[in-house]
């Protein structure tokens, strides 16, 4: 779903794109998974993301992803969207979890419910995570990468 529906009833295009605001879903899903599931620091997530996404021809793609749906991202793009993710996730989203109604925990392994596995203060500040990302992830790709 998009943030703002199309204002023109004859237009099939939304007035605002969620992905233009928060970043590509595939990158943000990647960020969410590795930060919440493994607790990796932002620079490690950026490293993993770069190695997963910088070259379309490298590695295997799931069978259901057509070639025209495959995206590559350079380091600057990965860092930009990871910075937005870190700020939104750690600084401006946790209060929502403390205001949810009571309910059961369903499933395991990665729940973001305040009744489940994830515990974060509702008044958290993202400064530590943002500083770690900015200090340890360059703004552009290195001249060469180690083989592998």
Predicted regions and their residues:
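ATP/NTP-dependent adenylation/nucleotidyl-transfer catalytic domains that generate, transfer
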Residues: 1-148
């Amino acid at each position: 779903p998009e943030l703002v529906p199309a204002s023109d009833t004859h237009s099939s295009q939304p007035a605002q794109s969620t992905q233009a605001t928060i970043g590509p879903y595939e990158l943000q899903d990647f960020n969410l998974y590795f930060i919440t599931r493994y607790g990796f620091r932002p620079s490690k997530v950026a490293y993993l993301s770069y190695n997963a996404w910088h070259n379309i021809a490298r590695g295997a793609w799931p069978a259901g992803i057509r070639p025209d749906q495959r995206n590559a991202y350079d380091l600057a793009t990965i860092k930009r969207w990871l910075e937005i993710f870190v700020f939104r996730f750690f600084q401006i989203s946790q209060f929502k979890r403390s205001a949810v109604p009571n309910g059961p925990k369903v499933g395991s392994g990665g729940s973001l419910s305040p009744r489940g596995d994830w515990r974060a203060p509702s008044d958290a500040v993202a400064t530590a995570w943002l500083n770690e990302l900015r200090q340890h992830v360059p703004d552009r790709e290195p001249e060469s990468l180690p083989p592998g």
